């Protein structure tokens, strides 16, 4: 089987991808048997190509799965941990913009009663 391109895989359905993955795994096992029994050099060099193709298929499957999950959870209140932004622990616990701008009743009253003084400079 020739080297598979990821862009060709992205258009396929999940069932097709799983079937292709199964075919690649069967081919890999046959190549490994050929390696043990002393197969041709062309078969031995093909093992690497097939392994990388399997990795490509799995990568495309996982990426599309994650993309679909992102679409599903978009706008929902709770998301799985792996779909939330990573950031650092401290950044995740930090107050958000709205919480930072909140003021207590006492602070609001003080600002209303004692506004900032405006001075005019005499030229």
Curated annotation (Swiss-Prot):
It comes from the Eukaryota. There is a cross-link at residue 25 (Glycyl lysine isopeptide (Lys-Gly) (interchain with G-Cter in SUMO2)). CDD domains: Ribosomal_L29_HIP. GO terms for molecular function: mRNA binding; structural constituent of ribosome. NCBIfam families: L29. Component of the large ribosomal subunit. Component of the large ribosomal subunit. The ribosome is a large ribonucleoprotein complex responsible for the synthesis of proteins in the cell. This is Large ribosomal subunit protein uL29. It comes from Bos taurus (Bovine). The gene is RPL35.
